[in-house]
């Protein structure tokens, strides 16, 4: 995982400060100074189930059909699509392995035949279409992650041969709460348009509504995540830390501008590709900011080590400052290569925080519940010990610690915002590196680099969650989601569907969601 080299570029900084677009100085970056490579850790799986994604209406792929009229071709394609998802022929939506039977590798078969049959995702082909060439030497599909509410696989998109991630959202329609949560996440994934936030590239064709139980979302495939990188033995340069932190805050500024709280920012939810581009993922716990302070918000959020003090103290109302606290913990973890506040229980978590920050004022605890305040006031009065942050590593410079101390503030109303954190001088080099050789918003020409006019864009309008107010039954939400997915089908792209014959797919559908121990722990009940 390497970062390209870059020299401080006065024109870019001028562009940033003045907010105008500028072409960079005219030297070409032919000789990048590569930073130490951070290869993604390999996943050890006992079996690599054979390869899994099929493209939809072949009419869309081959508009020119010599032997049939376009109308007939469209009809044939529609028939093929219907057959693929025809409830009459498939009693269950997908055949699942027999109970208790581990899905084994596919039986040996000629490679080409096996590859084509094994692809998990396929297009809706009809007899006149031909398989894309790249189906012959495809990587096997394999599980790459288990989120709070779903399983993620790495698969090949048969339309272009690109590797993508396929996320299965299972058991969507168990109850109304689950339906609403999944619909919210799905709408968010389709709403996001930002390079540091994971978004939906596609949603697989749903079957007939009577057989509609799971949702499959296609996203970009990322090779690693910040957790794997932090625990790996590879050195992390200060350039890596700056460019990672810059991208986390850039994505968070966008999310917060949309009025969204992520509520589970942790290293494992920050995906990183081989070019060090970072994307925030897993919106299973995200929600729109609650501006009415009298409305209670759930406390079952944020993995304990990254949980802000106001949540630990039972506050019934919190803001997007909880995400900034999590980022501060991650910043310290990037510097020190270990978890900053690694406690065994939520109460100990709070005690470790006050060991560093000192005993909070009553004003800083104003939103806490009485039991939590009593716990703090019963204990000894602690002085802050913030200078200890300089011992995290040699990279914990004055600027780094200054920014870190603006994030790790007990009182959420005094914690720095993502927007203000991005203006901190510590991040100037990260911004420069990102926009000089990593981003998609700036581009290079023969005369140099042309920078975007807005380095850290926000979204307008905000994400609208009013759709949730009128959802009253599982069947109603199911119909709305089914319709929503059909409407999302991207223009003239061939729709994708699951190939239920694929061995990998059989393994995929039997794979389970995170065990309860991996879920964010339940909130502390203060006496």
From Swiss-Prot:
It is found in: Nucleus; Cytoplasm. Phosphorylated on Thr-298. Intermolecular autophosphorylation on Thr-298 activates the enzyme. SUPFAM superfamilies: Protein kinase-like (PK-like). ATP binds at residues 144-152, 167. GO terms for cellular component: cytoplasm; nucleus. The active site is at 264 (proton acceptor). The modification Phosphothreonine is found at residue 298. The modification Phosphoserine is found at residue 522. Expressed at high levels in the brain, and at lower levels in heart, kidney, lung and liver. Residues 22-72, 90-139 are annotated as: Disordered. It is an enzyme of class 2 (transferase). The keyword Magnesium applies. A motif (TQE) lies at residues 298-300. GO terms for biological process: cellular response to osmotic stress; intracellular signal transduction; negative regulation of TORC1 signaling; negative regulation of Wnt signaling pathway; peptidyl-threonine phosphorylation; positive regulation of receptor signaling pathway via STAT; protein phosphorylation; protein stabilization. Residues 428-527 are annotated as: Required for homodimerization and kinase activation and localization to the nucleus. Homodimer. Homodimerization is required for intermolecular autophosphorylation, kinase activation and nuclear localization. Interacts with RNF138/NARF. Interacts with FOXO1 and FOXO3. Interacts with the upstream activating kinases HIPK2 and MAP3K7/TAK1. Interaction with MAP3K7/TAK1 seems to be indirect, and may be mediated by other proteins such as STAT3, TAB1 and TAB2. Interacts with and phosphorylates a number of transcription factors including FOXO4, LEF1, MYB, MYBL1, MYBL2, NOTCH1 and TCF7L2/TCF4. Serine/threonine-protein kinase that regulates a number of transcription factors with key roles in cell fate determination. Positive effector of the non-canonical Wnt signaling pathway, acting downstream of WNT5A, MAP3K7/TAK1 and HIPK2. Negative regulator of the canonical Wnt/beta-catenin signaling pathway. Binds to and phosphorylates TCF7L2/TCF4 and LEF1, promoting the dissociation of the TCF7L2/LEF1/beta-catenin complex from DNA, as well as the ubiquitination and subsequent proteolysis of LEF1. Contains a TQE activation loop motif in which autophosphorylation of the threonine residue (Thr-298) is sufficient for kinase activation. This mode of activation contrasts with that of classical MAP kinases, which contain a TXY activation loop motif in which phosphorylation of both the threonine and tyrosine residues is required for kinase activation. This is Serine/threonine-protein kinase NLK.
């Amino acid at each position: 995982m390497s970062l390209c080299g870059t020299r401080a570029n006065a024109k870019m900084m001028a562009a940033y400060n003045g907010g105008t677009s500028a072409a960079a100085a005219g030297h070409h970056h032919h000789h990048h100074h590569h930073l130490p490579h951070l290869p993604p850790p390999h996943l050890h799986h006992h079996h690599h189930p054979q390869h899994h994604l099929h493209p939809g209406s072949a009419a869309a792929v081959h508009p020119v059909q010599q032997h049939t009229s376009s109308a007939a071709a469209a009809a044939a394609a529609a028939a093929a699509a219907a057959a693929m998802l025809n409830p009459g022929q498939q009693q269950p939506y997908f055949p699942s392995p027999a109970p208790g039977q581990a899905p084994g590798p596919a039986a040996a078969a000629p490679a080409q035949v096996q590859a084509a049959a094994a692809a998990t995702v396929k297009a809706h082909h009809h007899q006149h279409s031909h398989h894309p060439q790249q189906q012959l030497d495809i990587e096997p599909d394999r599980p790459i992650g288990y989120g709070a509410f779903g399983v993620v696989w790495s698969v090949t998109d048969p339309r272009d041969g690109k590797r993508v991630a396929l996320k299965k959202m299972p058991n969507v329609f168990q109850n109304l709460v689950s339906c609403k949560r999944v619909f919210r996440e799905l709408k968010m994934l389709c709403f996001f348009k930002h390079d540091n936030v994971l978004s939906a590239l596609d949603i697989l064709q749903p079957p007939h509504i009577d057989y509609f139980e799971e949702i499959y979302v296609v996203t970009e495939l990322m090779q690693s995540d910040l957790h794997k990188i932090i625990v790996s033995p590879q050195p992390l340069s200060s350039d890596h830390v700056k460019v990672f932190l810059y991208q986390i805050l850039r994505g968070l500024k966008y999310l917060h501008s949309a009025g969204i709280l992520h509520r589970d920012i942790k290293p494992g939810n920050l995906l990183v590709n081989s070019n060090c581009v970072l994307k925030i993922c897993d919106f299973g716990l995200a929600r729109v900011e609650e501006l009415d302070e009298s409305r209670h918000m759930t406390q079952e959020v944020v993995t304990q080590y990254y949980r802000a003090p106001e949540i630990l103290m039972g506050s019934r109302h919190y803001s997007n400052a909880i995400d900034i606290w999590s980022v501060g913990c991650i910043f310290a973890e990037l510097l020190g290569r270990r978890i900053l506040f690694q406690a065994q229980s939520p109460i100990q978590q709070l005690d470790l925080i006050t060991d560093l920050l000192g005993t909070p004022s009553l004003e800083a605890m104003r939103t806490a519940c009485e039991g939590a305040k009593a716990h703090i006031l019963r204990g000894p009065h602690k002085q802050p010990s913030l200078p200890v942050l300089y011992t995290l590593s040699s990279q914990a410079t004055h600027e780094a610690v200054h920014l870190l101390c603006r994030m790790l503030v007990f009182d959420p109303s005094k914690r720095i915002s993502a927007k203000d954190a991005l203006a901190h001088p510590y991040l100037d080099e990260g911004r420069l590196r990102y926009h000089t050789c990593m981003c998609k918003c700036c581009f290079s020409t023969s005369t140099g680099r042309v920078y975007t006019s807005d380095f850290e864009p926000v979204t307008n309008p905000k994400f609208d969650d009013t759709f949730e107010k009128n959802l009253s039954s599982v069947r109603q939400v199911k119909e709305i989601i089914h319709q929503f997915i059909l409407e999302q089908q991207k223009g003239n792209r061939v729709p994708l569907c699951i190939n239920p014959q694929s061995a990998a797919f059989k393994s995929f559908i039997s794979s389970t969601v995170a065990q309860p121990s991996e879920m964010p722990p339940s909130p502390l009940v203060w006496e």
